[in-house]
Amino acid sequence: MKKFFIVAALAFFCTAAYSQEPVKTAQTQSAEVVVDDFKIVSDEVKDGVRYIVATPSAKVCSKKIEIEIIGDTIMKVVYTRGCQGNAKGIGALIKGMSVDEAIRRLDGITCGNRPTSCPDQLSRVLKTLK
């Protein structure tokens, strides 16, 4: 019974997040760029590290993606909200991976009957940054 409740609660949470309007994002030092169905909120370089913050499509459960890149290597990816275990897994798996390889592996992944997913949104953001 507990497993059913947890699965039902997770399904409700993801469905509710899917049906919500996109989260409004605050302006940062760099201009907000709207591309496709996601927004690049900030894109800054400090001490050789490129810091990117993006809000993914309202079609996915996550609400923010934070990316750190040095050269062409992804150093860190952190998702806010969404499926926590999967988001941590994505970040751990692509740490140290080249941007091109991450795009190749994540591009086009869907989530259920949705046309996109959290990994696909990351690949779209990375494509835009190239």
Question: Would you name each region that the model predicts?
Answer:
Residues 4-13:
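Sec-dependent N-terminal signal peptides
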Residues 12-14, 53, 75:
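A general, composition-driven signal for non-globular sequence regions
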Residues 17-20:
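Boundary of Sec targeting at the N-terminus
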Residues 24-70:
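Structured beta-strand/loop patches that form or line metal/cofactor-binding pockets in enzymes
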Residues 56-130:
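Active-site- and interface-proximal helix/loop "cap" or "latch" segments in soluble metabolic
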